[in-house]
Amino acid sequence: MNFEMPVETESNKETMEYLIKNSVNGMTYIQRFYRCVTNSSQIILVKTSREIQAKCQDDSKPYKLVPVGPLVQKPQDHDDDEKIMQWLRKREPSSVAFVSFGSEYFLSEEEMKEIADGLELSNVDFIWVVRFHGGSKVTSILEALPQGFLERTNGRGLIVDWAPQAKILQHSSTGGFVSHCGWSSTLEAMVYGVPIIAIPMQLDQPINAKLVVDMGVGMEMPRKNKELAKEEVASVIRRVVIEEGKEMRKTAKELSKRLKKEEDEEFDEAMKKLVQLVHESRINQVAASKET
């Protein structure tokens, strides 16, 4: 297979090392991946869109990558949504930065401090989902954040331990998404037309972040020796949400329209290919049984 990496980086090497060294049930992740691929019938269904991954689809011979669409779930209503959504409805259009790093990565104490200080310096309204690792010594939001942060950002910041991500991204007050660039989160932002402020942490996230930048729907946070700096955090958030936000949101909204337009078509095409594959498999089985 010839899956072309977008760019040769230290992050890509780290991703490969992770896949090679880590295992489940005695089989490494890279072994599981290749086993799935070699057992496939020349077709690999991918949670993506032609609009996003056209180059990768062209370079994957002899296997054909078939996009099934972003498969982004529609926002669900939950009882504890209302406080957050009520706060969001009071904000100006495209004025809020939504900050969330998914459910599998937990910020270090240093990262937490730089992001908090950066949000404070930016003067941009924000919703920040703050989570702690189960084994962490930190047990409360007050312990995790810089002293006085909540008081200094009172009125323009909302700190929560969970948030209805899809509903927030879909809301007109949301102007930017500070994200780790996990694939599902990246697709959600693209489908809802929200520019991404990328802070990739591990695995495929650096590759996803580069894709976001190349497509003109976000910016990656500059880091020196992988370390965040509050000044850069503030600067990039302001650029995406305020200073360059209008043009970037226009590009993101245009991409969103194209993705939604193609979504049903891509899914239907994928189902047709699966039906065809099953049909061909049955024909081959019948032919093989006649030969024996």
How does the language model describe each region?
Residues 1-167, 172, 176, 190-192, ...:
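Nucleotide-sugar-dependent glycosyltransferase catalytic domains
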Residues 179:
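A short, small-residue-rich loop immediately preceding and capping a beta-strand
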Residues 182:
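Aromatic "clamp/platform" in nucleotide-sugar-dependent glycosyltransferases that forms part
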